[in-house]
């Protein structure tokens, strides 16, 4: 599996002829460059232009299968589970809702629904936290086996702080931790919290299941 990072919460995972995009960036985003590659599956965690650009993951006549929201899915033999969590990313403080976003996206606790996705791809289990801003996960998710890889947001208004991001990553006991939604300051703080100031920094990451053997909470930084 090959992993690349494309700003914000956008991650591309490719193996063989299959490409999955997590959090594709829309052309309407004011913060990040829109996604510019084709994908077979697009996972949408949050109904916000920074993360709902499934149309940008289309190429020619090929359109991705879009997974958007909690539930159980199976696409091309890949089982995907989505779990409802909370995010306040991109909310208008005066209304507690993002501009132009439907009230159905609002949680009962305030904020918006952020879907955390769990799946196994190319023999590697992945947990993608999206734009989550809470450290308490749904019971069903907490009871699952430890993931091989967790993608965790560490900066941006409305997501976890670097400190909370590290606490959640530690609790999840993932073999590999990859930060998303980071800037230089928040990344530095997150790496300090994790005791990984000398973490490996790469433009793309190629992994096989055997590469994860013996790893415990190792942080790798993917450059956009």
Language-model regions, residue ranges each:
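Active-site-proximal beta-strand elements of phosphoester/diester hydrolases
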Residues: 2-5, 20-23, 77-85, 118, ...
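Binuclear metal-ion centers of metallo-dependent hydrolases, dominated by the metallo-beta-lactamase
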Residues: 4-6, 176-224
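Pre-active-site segment of Zn-dependent metallo-hydrolases
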Residues: 10-72, 81-92, 110-112, 132-143
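Short acidic-hydrophobic surface loop/beta-edge motif
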Residues: 11-13, 69-76, 119, 207-212
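Proline-aspartate-enriched helix->loop->beta-strand connector
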Residues: 39, 149, 156, 165-182
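Short Gly/Ser/Thr- and charged-rich N-terminal loops/segments
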Residues: 98-101, 105-109
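Mobile, glycine- and charge-enriched loop segments
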Residues: 111-158, 223
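Enzymes that bind and transform nitrogen-containing heteroaromatic metabolites
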Residues: 139, 143, 154, 161-165, ...
């Amino acid at each position: 599996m090959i992993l690349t990072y494309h700003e914000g919460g956008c991650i591309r995972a490719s193996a063989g002829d299959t490409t999955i995009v997590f959090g594709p960036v829309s052309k309407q985003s004011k913060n990040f460059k829109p996604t510019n590659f084709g994908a077979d599956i697009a996972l949408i965690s949050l109904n916000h232009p920074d993360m709902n650009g499934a149309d940008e993951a289309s190429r020619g006549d090929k359109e991705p299968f879009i997974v958007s929201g909690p539930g159980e899915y199976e696409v091309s033999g890949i089982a995907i589970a989505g779990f409802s969590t909370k995010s306040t990313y991109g909310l208008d403080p005066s209304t507690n809702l993002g501009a132009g976003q439907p009230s159905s996206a609002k949680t009962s606790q305030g904020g918006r629904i952020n879907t955390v996705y769990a799946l196994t791809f190319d023999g590697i289990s992945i947990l993608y936290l999206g734009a989550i801003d809470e450290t308490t996960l749904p019971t069903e998710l907490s009871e699952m086996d430890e993931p091989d890889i967790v993608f965790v947001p560490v900066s941006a208004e409305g997501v976890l702080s670097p400190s909370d991001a590290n606490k959640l990553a530690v609790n999840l006991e993932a073999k590999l931790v990859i930060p998303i939604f980071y800037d230089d300051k928040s990344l530095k703080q997150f790496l300090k919290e994790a005791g990984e100031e000398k973490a490996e920094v790469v433009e793309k990451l190629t992994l096989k299941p055997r590469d994860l053997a013996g790893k415990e909470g190792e942080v790798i930084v993917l450059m956009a």
